Amino acid sequence: MPKSERKILLDFEKPLAELENRINQIRELAKDCSSVDVSEQIYQLEAKATQLRQEIFSSLSPVQKLQLARHPRRPTSLDYIQAISDEWIELHGDRGGSDDPAIVGGLARVNGRPVVIIGHQKGRDTKDNVARNFGMASAGGYRKSIRFMEHGNRFGMPILTFIDTPGAWPGIEAERLGQGEAIAYNLREMFHLDVPIICTVIGEGGSGGALGVGVGDRLLMLEHSIYTVASPEACAAILWKDASKASQAAEALKITSWDLKKIGIIDDVVPEPSGGAHANPLQAAENLKTAIVKSLDDLNHLSSPQRRKKRYQKFRSMGVFLET
């Protein structure tokens, strides 16, 4: 989990931060003047802070959820892997000369059960983000991920994927190396794997970059994550030639977990701690682990042919339209 670092505040969090700072100041003053009892005042302010936190995080707009999904302190794939795994061995390379750092994966045990885990990996700071390409995988990253999936399928190990990317890397080099083909190959192969596949959006789920590791029997989303065909900024720039209309685009795109659950795109929403996953990473990881274990237990009751059939039907039912 992330170490304690300088707190980064989003605009809608500032009133809460001011109240928490006031509580801390009163506590410090009480230490210097032990004869004054401020316990009742602190109790009232803490109750007010709890209520304010609940009000803020229960009524977030889509664009505010987007800000949370992109929060620099939000737990990454490696944070969750290390928190939910009994054991973890990272694997490397696509066996074609590439080892894309934007994709991590390997073998793990979750509640004693051997699994393969794959995820997009963002950086923790600017230097790390540059090294990880901000979680935007290239063709080699998707070939690396399908290699790990095929390994899991060969040995009967369920596959867990963590999605957290603005999208696949759009660079010329990525296109030259077959970015589109690599993602398309993954989509086709994931439909045919025999083992259970559980995909979880832990932050940003952007376009084909998310889909490249996003075909599964269960699609989960953390409460304040987002899943979209295009970023709200890109959508606004395309439709209205004005990226400043991102808030309007975010509303129209239905990018939030509860919107997507309502229209049947995802299967379940994993609750986050009050204040978001970055406010209590360990609790967020525990919630995620509980949801994954439950999904694995449910999927184990199905045969491989049943899982493959339901997986295919699940994705075929998305985006159905009628011609008139």
Curated annotation (Swiss-Prot):
It catalyses: N(6)-carboxybiotinyl-L-lysyl-[protein] + acetyl-CoA = N(6)-biotinyl-L-lysyl-[protein] + malonyl-CoA. The gene is accA. PANTHER family: ACETYL-COENZYME A CARBOXYLASE CARBOXYL TRANSFERASE SUBUNIT ALPHA (PTHR42853), ACETYL-COENZYME A CARBOXYLASE CARBOXYL TRANSFERASE SUBUNIT ALPHA, CHLOROPLASTIC (PTHR42853:SF3). The keyword Phosphoprotein does not apply. The lineage of its organism: Bacteria, Bacillati, Cyanobacteriota, Cyanophyceae, Oscillatoriophycideae. Keywords: ATP-binding, Cytoplasm, Fatty acid biosynthesis, Fatty acid metabolism, Lipid biosynthesis, Lipid metabolism, Nucleotide-binding, Transferase. It comes from Trichodesmium erythraeum (strain IMS101). GO terms for molecular function: acetyl-CoA carboxylase activity; ATP binding; carboxyl- or carbamoyltransferase activity. This is Acetyl-coenzyme A carboxylase carboxyl transferase subunit alpha. Residues 44-298 form the CoA carboxyltransferase C-terminal domain. The keyword Transferase applies. Pfam families: ACCA. GO terms for biological process: fatty acid biosynthetic process; malonyl-CoA biosynthetic process. Belongs to the AccA family. It is found in: Cytoplasm. Acetyl-CoA carboxylase is a heterohexamer composed of biotin carboxyl carrier protein (AccB), biotin carboxylase (AccC) and two subunits each of ACCase subunit alpha (AccA) and ACCase subunit beta (AccD). Its main location: cytoplasm. GO terms for cellular component: acetyl-CoA carboxylase complex.
